[in-house]
A protein has these predicted regions:
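Short helix-initiation/N-cap motifs at beta->coil->alpha
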Residues: 65, 81-91, 134, 153, ...
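Ligand-binding cleft/hinge of the Venus flytrap
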Residues: 52-56, 68-77, 139, 152-171, ...
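Sec/Tat signal peptide C-region and signal peptidase I cleavage site
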Residues: 21-28
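Periplasmic-binding protein-like
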Residues: 123-130, 192, 196, 200-241, ...
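Flexible hinge/capping segments at coil-to-helix
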Residues: 130-147
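Extended ligand-binding regions for polar small-molecule ligands
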Residues: 66-74, 146, 151-153, 218-259
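Extracytoplasmic small-molecule ligand-binding "clamshell" domains
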Residues: 29-104
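Alpha-to-beta junction loops
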Residues: 40-41, 76-78, 95-103, 146, ...
């Protein structure tokens, strides 16, 4: 009887060890799979200049695209840029349509329940943008006004939570700026960096409200990957830290933004 119980215990322990090893191996598989495939599929909207947009050669370029390509290169693989609407970008990641999201995504507790983040890879501030000659001077002046936001981003959620704004959602910044200039919206709410870069190119006259205490005034943005991939996360984090340390990140940031936005 004792021998039989001992045999059962040994068998059970073996199963447990095998299961633990299999789980550990499965969690490491994604990094190995990427290296085997030779490709890192990177998702972004393609509608968010200067972070991701389509150039005259029909190529998706920008800060996010360059960061994704640089990370892939240091992982020893090639980057495949995939554009997809931002509001469904996490769902696409979980469905394994791509391997990472480099799309200026704000790190939030809600998103951290669904995905893991590498980074932050830059920081930005929430901006309330109006036309230069607008009568809107402070946050309270937005009461009852129409504001534009990017569909699915953290600023859309913030604007809708205010309860006193009419919120109009857009796929990207260019359409928002056109509607702001035409008076179809009174303001737009989004990260400050892309707005400043965009209007520098278009010559559009805008003003950013002074809102030092606004929620999300300075936020961290990260690279999203699927959960339970500790080796992939650690490797990508190390690659990003190396880029920050050796000047590669600053070079990309200066090219697309004109300043170091880490």
């Amino acid at each position: 009887m004792f021998k039989h119980k001992l045999t059962n215990l040994i068998a059970a322990a073996a199963v447990a060890i095998t299961a633990t090893f299999s789980l550990s191996h499965a969690r490491a598989d994604e990094l190995a799979t990427l290296k085997d495939s030779g490709e890192l599929r990177v998702a972004m909207s393609g509608q968010y200049p200067p972070f991701s947009f389509t150039n005259d050669q029909n190529q998706v370029v920008g800060f996010d695209a360059s960061i994704g390509e640089a990370i892939a290169e240091r992982l020893g693989v090639k980057a495949k840029i995939i554009t997809t609407p931002f509001d469904g970008i996490i769902a696409g990641l979980l469905a394994k349509k791509y391997d990472a999201v480099v799309a200026s995504m704000t790190i939030t507790p809600e998103r951290e329940k669904a995905v893991d983040f590498v980074g932050p890879y830059y920081h930005a501030g929430r901006a309330i943008v109006v036309k230069a000659d607008s009568s809107i001077q402070k946050l309270e002046d937005l009461n009852g006004k129409i504001v534009g936001v990017t569909l699915g981003d953290a600023h859309e959620k913030w604007a809708k939570a205010q309860g006193n704004l009419t919120v109009r959602s857009y796929k990207g910044l260019p359409e928002m700026l056109v509607d702001l200039d035409a008076g179809r919206i009174n303001a737009l709410v989004m990260d400050s960096v892309p707005v400043m870069v965009a209007v520098k190119e278009t010559g559009q006259k805008i003003r950013i409200l002074d809102t030092p205490n606004i929620e999300g005034g300075r936020v961290a943005l990260g690279i999203a990957i699927r959960k339970n991939n500790p080796e992939l996360k650690a490797k990508m984090q190390k690659v990003l830290e190396d880029m920050l340390a050796d000047g590669a990140y600053e070079k990309i940031s200066m090219k697309w933004i004109g300043s170091d936005i880490r």
